[in-house]
Amino acid sequence: MDRYGNLSDDGEVDHSFFDSDVDESANKVGVASVGSNKQENINTNVNKDVNKISFENKQNVMSGEKGRNHVYEEKIAKPSSPSTAAVAPRPDSALKSGRTSAQSLRIEATIPTGIPQIRREFEDNYYPDEEDSSEDECHNSRPKTAKQTNIGKKSTGKSNRDFVSTISSSDTEYSDTGSDDGASKSSYQSSKGSLMRSPERKPSRSSMRELRHYAEESEDTVTDVTPLSTPDISPIQSFDLAATSEVLKSTFKRQENISQEIYDPDNDLRINQKAVQDAVDLNQLLKAFMHLDKKEPSSVQDENPVMHNKKNFSFSNDEVRQIERENQRLLKELTRQAAKPRSKSLTPKKPMSAPTRLYHSAINRQKEQQRIERENMALLKRLESVKPTVGMTRTEQLMDYQRQAGYLSATALSPRPGKASVSRLSPSVSSGGFSRMSSATNRSERTGSSGALLRPTRSGNVRAAWQ
């Protein structure tokens, strides 16, 4: 796309794009002016040939791809045909653009035939040189191809469909072979300019016949070399819009038919009626269920007498009625008692247990336990009544101990009046207690003798605690 940006409004060209042609720029040939009458004659002849080409193109399209390939191979096999003699400057232009003769011949077969007429519309009797013609051809390539496609559209409907597929694939071909197509167009323009410059050479019937062969082959194999970004008034764009509009119209009609089927008011009415009918059926069904629910209690009440009328083989009917009345009375009594509030005393009363008789051994154990408890209580009272000693010396402690030991021995030997518990003791117990007391007296005597050695004792003044 950038190579077309060098074109200015007045037709001048930046020749940096054609750096590959600098070596041969000295071989430019001057352009000779041609009279308007010759140009008009050429244009009228070309228009007639275009009409013939359109008629023959219709027949060529109906023939298969096989016929076109055969014609193309036959054309290549005859390099010395009159068409090549009439288009003599083409090899020079092809050599100038850096292409071989075979490549030039292949691209010439794809050039549309409406180019001279388009040149008359855009260039009033102005014939530039070879470089200018190639640049103008690159600049005006889109309208030329568009005009040829319009001619093909008028000729046949099948060619339109083939041409649409060719246009869709031409954009990709243009991206790959942009520079090559520009060179081939320059070669074709130079050859066409040489034909129009020479007054002696006029288009003969053989050249027109060869052009018809080219047109027949190029109708279905035309290559679109237009730039990707084209103006909004492009004829090819309008052709594409026309082709797509027909498809859209057909699809819109189909969609309209579908939408009419979907949004048909009769269909909506049927749907509404069906919904109302379903609601009515549901309402009736609910009413029937409610009616059955009302009938069920009455049917249960009616079944009870039937059950009473049935004969009971165990009891008579009168006995059965009496039993049922008694059951009802008991049930009411139980419910009334359950309904009463509970008594204030929630704690249950202790049951009065009958006195149990014990064995003699158990009675003896209880009596012995009671005696031990009584002695313990007496000792506890004695200990509570005792005051602490005055001195803390060893002798004072020993004296206090002797006093206590004498008290214990005296109580063990002389029973208290009014109590015969000591005399009633068993011999084992009494002997055990006596042995303990005797050992205690012996210890007291030893301590007393040791204390007598330390200091003199006042035996006459000592008296027992209970005296």
Swiss-Prot record:
Skewed-composition ranges (Acidic residues): 124-135
Highest taxon above the source species: Eukaryota
Q: Where is this region: Disordered?
A: 1-20, 76-235, 336-370, 412-467
Taking the record's annotation, the residue ranges forming a coiled coil are 310-387
Q: Where is the composition biased (Low complexity)?
A: 180-194, 421-439
Point to the regions of Polar residues compositional bias: 162-177, 223-235
Q: Spans of biased composition, class Basic and acidic residues?
A: 198-216
> Which keywords does this chain's UniProt record carry?
Coiled coil
Pfam families the record matches: Hmw_CFAP97 (PF13879)
Entries under InterPro entries matching the protein: Cfap97/Hemingway (IPR038791), Hmw/CFAP97 (IPR029488)
By its UniProt entry, which PANTHER family does this protein fall under? CILIA- AND FLAGELLA-ASSOCIATED PROTEIN 97, CILIA- AND FLAGELLA-ASSOCIATED PROTEIN 97-RELATED
In the record, the note on similarity to other proteins reads: Belongs to the CFAP97 family.
Identification of the protein by name:
Cilia- and flagella-associated protein 97
Task: Tell me the name of the encoding gene.
Answer: cfap97
